[in-house]
Amino acid sequence: MQEIRNIAIIAHVDHGKTTLVDRMIYQARQAREQEKLGELILDNNDLERERGITILAKNVSVVYKGVKINVIDTPGHSDFGGEVERVLNMADGVILLVDAFEGCMPQTRFVLQKAIEMGKKPVLVINKVDKLNCRPDEVQEEVFDLMFSLGATEDQLDFRTVYGSAKQGWMSHDWREPASDITALLDTILEVVPAPEVVEGTPQMLISSLEYSPYVGRIAVGRVTRGSLKAGMNTTLCKRYDIQQKQKIKELMVFDGLGKAKVEEVNCGDICAVVGLEGFEIGDTVADFENPEALPPIEVDEPTMSMLFCINNSPFFGKEGKFVTSRHLKERLEKELEKNLALRVKPGPNADSFIVYGRGVLHLSVLIETMRREGFELQVGQPKVLDKVIGGQRCEPIEMLTIDLPEEFVGRAIEMVTRRKGALIQMEGRGDRTHLEFDIPSRGLMGLRSNLLTATQGEAVVAHRLKGYEPYKGDIERRTNGSLVSLETGLSVAYSMDKLQDRGRFFIEPGVEIYEGQVVGEHTRERDLNINICKTKKLTNMRASGSDDKVMLPPPIVFSLEEALEYIQEDELVEVTPKSMRLRKIILNEIERKRKSSDFNC
């Protein structure tokens, strides 16, 4: 029986974990044609490559010195915590990967805490030591202090450290002495990470993740915790609430390099993919046919945010997307629920809408962006934070926020966060930059990142993670400026936009199709202003001077999806289609809007 090591990689967004896995595959000669080896093999989802983040956990295996190493790539962002907890169930050890300059970030802390609670022993990899002004020795001390504060055992605190640069393709035990490859890391994994415990008995496998194939349907992925599974064997699927179903395994596959290989039998401790099970959910157990014993199901953190999803009912409905009806939207959300553990969906206030609950703005915006690329047209409302009643008191989610920024912007950043009910916990200098830590309500984070980046000229590095629930902190003032709302449907005209420049900043360029009720800019004052930017210049038979037709407009403000979701007010929606993104009022007609607001005020 082949020796196995199961290891998960923990790292913050963009600290280089996917690059490191690529190097491990390269080293183990798994990529057949090395010259054609692309970068970031693991981030196979367009969104993941663009944003430089890993959203879905993926499995890869490499064979080194005759030992099979199953590497599980975890998402680094706490918004995808649902993925993280499942993945750690499959691993026996973890690689903690940190940036030699940035050190441990809040998201790393979130996943590390989960790993320590589960008793996993880490191997610390300090990456990017080729960067200027890196501080590997200080970072190692920081990681030790962090693990101590998270309640790690003595054995866990006695961790091994490997330094290197995944991008340049080397790892060594001393960062001042670069090596030629990453064998130092692979050897350390074999020494430190324990082999999986082999438990004899009837088979048991906990389904930890799910893959989908257009040919065979849903595939269950998990680790065999006891006994062995064989292709064609009859099993019992143990679901929640003591429900049991008799099922047959059609095919068994193990992870081989980047792909999968069919096998007849999978032994205890290996990670495999099972084809042929129907109606399973993540957290179910594949058990013995005659004497089924269920494993405890996976616990996942609760959602902290909700958002209204509804069909696109704007005047431009159906022009750009393929899937535009509420039936399409419902089917897509139900499909997402099968593999996205931290998501919940409930019916909305009317038949065409749904309330979707998730872990944060990033979690939900990734779903919206994926749907947009698949050809969906939809509209989404302002994100709302979910409160809880604990001991008869209204409580709200509190996040731990860290900001790294140049010294000259510290005062401005502290003022912006405290205005949103944030409390400064820690402040320390790191060279020419300052590290700030705050506790802040989740709702205070909406729109904060874009404002901080503007105030610090793009220099701030912002990260946050859920800390827990605390009593409600009071009202937070939201965006103070009103919107510039279009009165007409038609093409935007430079002539009329030029005349309205002093009233605010625009989100669109001249010559763009707009409709009545679309938010086309931000007003300089508090209330909304209805404007007509479709008005053209009246032609006369008088000859105009040459300077008259030269209009100078500043470039429009362009939002990313997250920024748009954080920017909109309660009476606004974001319209998302495959080709464009627009902000609009829920009620498009100006007279109806006024009537509604006067009824509300009465």
Model-derived segments and their meaning:
Residues K121, L132-E191:
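Canonical P-loop GTPase G-domain recognition
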